[in-house]
Amino acid sequence: MNRAIVIAGPTGVGKTKISIDLASELNAEIISSDSAQVYKGLNIGTAKITEKEMQGIKHHLIDIVEPISKYSVGNFEKDVNKILNQNPEKNFLLVGGTGLYINSVTNGLSILPEADKKTREYLSTLNNQALLELALKYDEEATKEIHPNNRVRLERVVEVFLLTGQKFSELSKKNIKNNNFKFLKIALERDRENLYNRINKRVDIMFEQGLVDEIKNLYKIYGEKLYKLNIIGYNETIDYINGKISLDEANYRIKLNSRHYAKRQFTWFKADKEYQWFNLDEVSEQEIVKTIYTLFNIKA
């Protein structure tokens, strides 16, 4: 079985430096696993790696779609598996913090059906009580975990049953993995106070580098479609550009939302017990790279 390495962790933890050093040691290519860095032109606000920082290491799935294009976990899963399956002899690092994307490759995608327009139109005609009753009828287990007023999730439970005849709660546990790779999963962390300080500092640097100008230019081209991407750093700055909040408030909100996002990322990766964790406040980057290199070669 072929093998690859995952380098995951929360935003701002320091994945880039370690991934570049490790890729150099292993003569590996890097597959960006970041849901925002696929978009062209979104550079400063996504802390996108620069050509200089790449140090000649080949990177995949950066700057591949326009901000008006839809790019989903399904697109990512297909793109990554194509790269892996066409180059089984190469070493690859999946590097990023979008857990759902990484999981789609390492553990496979759910076999749940895609949304169906006609079914959604029908369900939209039902009142909340009727929808809740249908959801309970078709899948009581899943429905018990959903707030009675959460129409989006209730509609999905009913939709899945109508389309497949099977329960959402059962299908959602079944995945299809479309590659023959085994993944060495590495996650990076720091002490929380230090991580949050790094995040705050990085946001300040983004503003110094010209975040507002970057987003002004993008907003002129893409308008509200840019806002609909719902990417931290961009929505808050667009609110500032539109006069809804001050620049200081935008800065504050980006820091706050980034810290909250880091916490969610940490929780996501901790839930997967296959990850081996390294604390960058306790172990040097060089030691971590050396250890990962050894683990990869021992188990290769």
Task: Locate predicted features.
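Phosphate/pyrophosphate-binding catalytic cores of soluble transferases and nucleic-acid-acting enzymes
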Residues: M1-A300
